[in-house]
């Protein structure tokens, strides 16, 4: 098991950073996630945000750029953990890629929307994709039955809420509202960063962004 080392100041920071020794591995892994309370009114926005940020204006751009620059795997996803919803950014690169390069790529993906915004075209495209994913889940009878059972047994709690969002909530989400939600998330959400590789103090500079 890989031991994790916390690197924390004396006060409780909004951005917490953990290092894991990874010299024996062939790649470096950088994971950043926003830790959000799982609520019905924001669950679908968060799930859609992951779709929009992953694809952006160019459906193959970010992933292709990461592959060309770093021989890397890049992804954004949403994970449900108990009563929390995690918006997760992950970048896995070859060992010869500098930590500063990884951070520059991550920052570009994180903060470019604050300058460029989201277009209605992109948001509508990703809404269709997310809606199809959610409808496909309903077609999986066993998975749908498990989800319905959880909704009933955990009724009235965050555990009953789907971390994948709800198709019926997509219609009311537009580009402007989604950008406002993302801006608030960047300014207020708890952030955790995990890095598996050779320890580099450059990672601590992420705290300046949150």
Q: Where on the chain are the PLM-derived regions?
A:
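N- or domain-start disorder-to-order transition segments that initiate the globular core
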Residues: 1-28
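Histidine-acidic residue clusters that define the catalytic metal-binding segment
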Residues: 2-10, 150-191
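M16 family metallopeptidases and their MPP-like homologs
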Residues: 18-20, 25-51, 60-111, 143-168, ...
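Hydrophobic side chains in well-ordered alpha-helices
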Residues: 101-102, 181, 202-206
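A common structural junction motif
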Residues: 106-117, 206-210
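Acidic/histidine-enriched alpha-helical segments
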Residues: 112-135
